[in-house]
Amino acid sequence: MNKTELTAAVNTRRTFAIISHPDAGKTTITEQMLLFGGVVRQAGTVKARKSGNFAKSDWMEIEKKRGISVTSSVMQFDYDGKRINILDTPGHEDFSEDTYRTLMAVDSAVMVIDSAKGIEPQTKKLFQICKMRGIPIFTFMNKLDRDGREPLDLLNEVEEVLGIETYPMNWPMGMGKGLKGLYDRYNHRVELYHNEAHGETFLPLDENGELDPSNELTKDSIYRDTLDEVELINEAGNDFDEAKVMAGDMTPVFFGSALTNFGVETFLKTYLQYAPKPAAHKTRDDQVVQPTDDEFAGFVFKIQANMNPNHRDRIAFVRICSGEFDRGMDVVLQRTGKKMRLNNSTQFMADTRETVETAVAGDIVGLYDTGNFQIGDTIYAGKNAVQFEKLPQFTPELFMRVTAKNVMKQKSFHKGIEQLVQEGAVQLYTSYSTGDYILGAVGQLQFEVFKFRMQNEYNSEVVMEPMGSKTARWIDPEQLDEKMSSSRNLLVKDRYGAPLFLFENAFAERWFADKYPDVKLTSKL
């Protein structure tokens, strides 16, 4: 496509992540959006685990069983003239590394908050990553169909705990059994709750911001209370400032109920009016790659094995940062300098996929991977080499020794470990002295998922022996003497062959530093 067509296509893209604490309703709101995009025919299937109707975004077997998202799914659909790429992030804290990387691939975030609980620990963590990146954050206060906290309390908490200004785009008229509707400040109307809407869903407000006096609702005390509260926020609240929203310093707040599909479409439509187009990306040498640059470039932010268990496949997820992707095009893998042809490409609806012929900056494409890619890789098609900024990686804190339960199944054991480690699901270390495999993770759940997937996807039962929490510290190979290793500081190498010590506690690390004052240890990964 020519420059004008490319720019027009890029301008329709909206790529965002949904962040929340577990159980705040993230999966349900995702389902409702897919419903509006005509992608799913039935929403509200998320809770119905016994019926076999699992959430579209929770495709992995363990996610279906436990009802939590443990990997980031990618879903694409068209709505209101925009092409939307939603990245669903794991809500569970043990999967922060996968989530961090996912948040590097989006241009904005939707924060879902349970109106009965307010800000919860995981929401706070994920918010801070978005804040660090300076991306716009839009808030959906969920579960209005149940009794929750006072809306003003919720806004105050967001401002105080997260340090971001709020602007309520609408205001609840009651909650729980007394929910009447939403007073929509932005669209200047009242959106009636399903039970209250007899034929009409939206009622216009007059120039004073009130309903026609002949409407029955005007006699309800909930309506009068809402007018008082709206008057208060009009006078004492923040003014809407689009520049602040774009800088991530103000969050537009929407109320609603994802479960009953109330206020979700209004949110989606309004969000799409303000959500940013694909942003420019910085390279490691401080160059800026614009989305409408002619040459294709993108980076791998996630690798997922066994999206189709029948084929033992691996998919590398690529965020396109500039130009146009065409199936069959030649690109260079920056890390190796190797040329490769991208024949097998796909786009997703969680577990269903279709071959993609073309895509542009802002889109997420999946590339079938035979082991070429690593997380953080840059691929580019132009003459000038491009290398995007490094993706964050975490030093594990928990460690387990892992062996195959059945020694006759070493082949599937090694294949499973290799693939799951390349995904970044766990880190792998090998003992210098014994050759034992040691897994490292940020949280316990990662080990559980690893064990489950080894058995389920690779037919390899594993024995895992806890080693407790350790501190990982890398050492320059030139300074290494294998005699430095002891029971308190185990010498291992990482998957790239770099040596490091696993210290059992801070005391062991201090003792080592005193004994070898010239040796420099780092916590890098």
Swiss-Prot record:
Q: Spell out the InterPro entries in the cross-references.
A: EF-G-like_DII, EFG_III/V, G_TR_CS, P-loop_NTPase, PrfC, RF3_C, RF3_dom_3_sf, RF3_GTP-bd
Detail which positions bind GTP. Answer: 20-27, 88-92, 142-145
Query: Which NCBIfam families does this chain map to?
Result: prfC, PRK00741.1, small_GTP
Q: Which family does it belong to?
A: Belongs to the TRAFAC class translation factor GTPase superfamily. Classic translation factor GTPase family. PrfC subfamily.
Give residue ranges for domain tr-type G. 11-279
| UniProt GO MF annotations | GTP binding; GTPase activity; translation release factor activity, codon nonspecific; translation release factor activity, codon specific
Q: Does the keyword GTP-binding apply?
A: yes
Give the protein's recorded name: Peptide chain release factor 3
